[in-house]
């Protein structure tokens, strides 16, 4: 029984890592999942909204 729980827990953590869940996302379940990346939580995150706004501005 203990081994089964350990295996399931390990598989759960592996799936979270596979799908790119961060510790910040798990720690804050109230956060809006459709919001852009939090620059404070991940300084290397790509700011897609900023890139889209700049492309729209450049292309007219």
From Swiss-Prot:
Annotated coiled-coil segments of the chain: none
AXPX repeat locations: 27-30, 31-34, 35-38, 41-44
Record keywords: Amidation, Antibiotic, Antimicrobial, G-protein coupled receptor impairing toxin, Immunity, Innate immunity, Mast cell degranulation, Membrane, Repeat, Secreted, Signal, Target cell membrane, Target membrane, Toxin
Residues where Leucine amide is found: 59
One cellular component term from this protein's GO annotations in UniProt: other organism cell membrane
Single GO biological process annotation from the record: defense response to bacterium
Location of this chain's protein in the cell: Secreted; Target cell membrane
Major localisation: secreted
Positions of the pro-segment in this chain: 28-45
Cleaved signal peptide residues: 1-27
The keyword Repeat is assigned to this record: yes
Tissues expressing this chain: Expressed by the venom gland.
Family membership: Belongs to the MCD family. Mastoparan subfamily.
Protein name (database record): Mastoparan-V
Phylogenetic placement of the source organism: Eukaryota, Metazoa, Ecdysozoa, Arthropoda, Hexapoda
């Amino acid at each position: 029984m203990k081994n089964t729980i350990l295996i399931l827990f390990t598989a759960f953590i592996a799936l979270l890592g596979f799908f790119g869940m961060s510790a910040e996302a798990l720690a804050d379940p109230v956060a809006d999942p459709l919001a852009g990346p939090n620059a404070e939580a991940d300084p290397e995150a790509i700011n897609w909204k900023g890139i889209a706004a700049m492309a729209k501005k450049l292309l007219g």
